[in-house]
Regions:
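Two-component/phosphorelay signaling modules centered on CheY-like receiver
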Residues: 9-27, 114
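Acidic catalytic/metal-coordinating carboxylates
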Residues: 30-31, 57-60
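Active-site beta3 strand of CheY-like receiver
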Residues: 42-48
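Active-site residues of response regulator receiver
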Residues: 50, 78
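Receiver (REC) domain active-site loop signature in two-component systems and cognate sites
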Residues: 53
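Alpha4 helix (beta4-alpha4-beta5 surface) of REC/receiver domains from two-component response regulators
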Residues: 60, 81-96
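C-terminal output helix
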Residues: 84, 102-112
């Protein structure tokens, strides 16, 4: 299952629909806390997460998963990223960092690469 964690309902739904249209099972979560409370982090094959969200940020979610030794490939998407943020995410193990708006094919290629890693 590919988890999509983003507080933007329309983007989360669009990404879920895109993944499911190419046969990839996906589930959306409105916040990092909702994702963690679902108990599905250890059954997640790939995580697509926004960096900036109310409550726990995407980077804080990444740190939490790393502390739990939950090594899920993470693709970050953000409208407000900078180079420092990108480097921090990569240093902590993110496989990709995409700026919004992103090309659907680039996202799909990133997901496929993450699933193969």
């Amino acid at each position: 299952m590919i988890a999509i964690v983003d507080d933007d309902d329309s983007l989360r739904t669009a990404v879920q629909d895109l993944l499911e249209a190419v046969g990839l099972p996906a589930q959306g979560f409105a916040s990092a806390e909702e994702f963690l409370n679902s108990g599905k982090q250890h059954g997640t094959a790939c995580l697509i997460a926004d960096i900036r969200m109310p409550g726990m940020s995407g980077l804080e979610l990444q740190a939490h998963l790393n502390a739990e030794r939950c090594r899920v490939p993470i693709i970050f998407i953000t409208a407000h990223g900078d180079e420092k943020m990108r480097l921090q995410a990569r240093r902590e193990g993110a496989v990709e960092f995409l700026s919004k708006p992103f090309d659907n094919e680039v996202l799909l290629d990133s997901v496929r690469a993450a699933l193969e890693s």
